[in-house]
Amino acid sequence: LSKFDIIGGGDGDDTVSITGHDGVTALKMSDLQLTSVETFKVTATNNKVININADSATPSNFITVENATTAKTTDITNLAAGSAVTLENTVNGQTIGVVTLGLKDPSGSSDAITINVNGTSGQGAETVDQIIVADVETINLSSGSVGVTPMVASDSNVITDQSYSTATALNITGAANLTMSNAIVGTVLTTIDASAMTGNLALTAAAVVLDLKTGSGADTLTFGTTLTVDDVIDAGSNPSVLSVDSLSATINELGTSAA
């Protein structure tokens, strides 16, 4: 795909896909002649990084595919507020590396983006090393599956580290299990709402006062020494006695929590 190709998507939800991407130099979306294309899907060349400059009117959705390579970075800059980025992990035993997302215009006070983390059914733990987002106030994070075959109970999307420096709200949804290994870095984060999530959620909370809600899965919440009287926790309803939520913390101050 080059700047000389002209693609018009017309009506509907249209996707343009490329393979063999080598992100040594950023792919500039403004160089491409795409109209009415909603989604752009990129599969890297084996052992190469993904690097996209999203400064363009279209598309607003990006899909990146991990290509049999461990821990290669993904950088998408100049995103518009409201954009969606999907990270597809398709190979067992390989991880997506550090993912860094940034907006073109960071001046807004209520900017949101959506991040979809999708793993492959039957592959066990599918890992993203780290997600870094700045200049965004609301992160909508979804845990799902690649393709139409859902991840099974023994599978989980895993995000080792997360840094959301300006986010005040993190909304989590999805039917696939999700593990957040290390504490979320977010000094102004006040709300984590996973009440709509049906998969199991394992979360290590940020070291801030939180209003935290989880969904109908068997959720595991870890607070360490950060749980205080000001935290509000609602672990949601569970569909059976076999689906049990758990919370661990070294308690300094404790008020009322709901489980």
Feature map (PLM): residue ranges:
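Solvent-exposed, low-complexity segments and loops of surface/extracellular structural proteins
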Residues: 1-259
